Amino acid sequence: MSDPRKRNSAAMTDGPSRAPARSYLKSIGFNDKDLARPIVGVAHEWIETMPCNFNHRRLAERVKEGVRAAGGTPMEVNTISVSDGVSMGTDGMRASLISREIVADSIEIASVGHSFDALVVIVGCDKTIPAGAMVLARLNIPGLVLYSGSIAPGRFRERDVTIQDVFEGVGAHAAGKMSAADLMELENVACPGAGACGGQFTANTMATALEFLGISPPGANTVPATDSGKNDTAFEAGRLVMSLLDQGACPRDFITRESIENAITAVLATGGSTNGVLHLMAIASEAGVPLELEDFDRISARVPILADLKPWGTYVATDVFKAGGLSVIARELLKGGHLHGDVRYVDGQTLSDVAAAAAETQGQCVIASIDNPIKETGGLLILRGNLAPDGCVIKVSGQKREVFSGPARVFDGEEACFEAVIAQDIEPGSFVVIRNEGPAGGPGTVSYTHLTLPTSALV
């Protein structure tokens, strides 16, 4: 009699008629015992074009070990990724947001095509993170997302540096404030190994969101990419997905209106990326949960900023880990009544459970208390007007002023803007408008980070 947990894979592996399929699988090392167990997909985006996903194959091996230890048979799947940091300022950036759909679609196709009973998606670079949640919500088979971790800061002349410093170094060099030799020295040390961008850019914003969404194990996403504990989180993810399979617990059990509001709250409280709006709306859509732009504005009006994180602040994701992790932020937000405490994580704990167990590092300066926030309201605003009648998103995490007035410089594309910046042809106090970078103009809905390179040069 087939294992009742083989809800999908029995059709692929069981019975005399499936002998050809079993023969194929036995040719690459699977045996009858393996094929009698539930089949768990382990998907990742290892690629040799970026540090963000460079540890995925190693983590996938550990996830697979965890699956086997809990009585399942893992099957590894690899798909593509596009690095914003590498492609920025080139035509390759047009592929960035499109890659989110391709990652989700390709994992879905592999999962359906090979009758996976459950799925673990290892994610790293910006667009892979929402893609992992999107495909789980779409398939709605037992599964979870594991973030492969943030990069550690580099060291440059006795201070910590990140890729943000390199971007700003490009502007400093263009302005004659930094020599080519110094820029090269900075370039060589800013990124010391595997991991996604260290600031609260898109990757760490979405890794934060997915923990509060409940679709990632609590505490797992904040463990840095090169920390020895990352292997342990991967092994436990493999064991945990088998527990979800035993229970019949599926992603849409966790991705609810309340958990999405928790994720939005976490993005706002950490000064997260505008891309958080774009991606959370896509995840909600896949899960069948209604979500509007106004929901972000409503929550932002009452949620304070508690984490002092780059690009506007002082610290990076590895510092959040050292300070006690996202559970400390959850504890403070829960104190202020900003979270739904009864929302469950994939490991069965509620958010209240996780917050109650928070272990804050004494003397840490990264995460503020709810009684003394860094800023009284959240880091994102939704605006409407003649330039954006359907709404637009702006990030105000590091801004104190509420009004800006200045002459507009309008460019038809990022390339023209960047040329003007490098030529120092933009007056201080100008309002820079870059047109034709949307779905039709880009084309392909060029990511907001496409603008990072020229705006970082405005120093």
What are these regions (language model features)?
Residues 1-26, 33-34, 373-376:
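N-terminal amphipathic/basic leader segments beginning at the initiator methionine
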Residues 20, 25-26, 73-121, 178, ...:
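Glycine-rich oxoanion-binding loops at beta->alpha junctions
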Residues 21, 65, 307, 316, ...:
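Long, structured protein-protein interaction/assembly regions in large complexes
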Residues 38, 44-51, 124-137, 196-216, ...:
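Conserved phosphate/anionic-ligand binding catalytic regions in large, soluble enzymes, centered on
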Residues 55-98, 278, 295, 388-405:
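Anionic-ligand anchoring segments at beta-strand to alpha-helix junctions in alpha/beta enzyme folds, i.e.
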Residues 96-262, 267, 272:
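Active-site cavity-forming subdomains of large catalytic enzyme subunits
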Residues 217-237, 276-316, 321-354:
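Terminal amphipathic helices with adjacent charged low-complexity linkers/tails
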Residues 449-455:
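Conserved small/polar residues in nucleotide/adenosyl-binding loops
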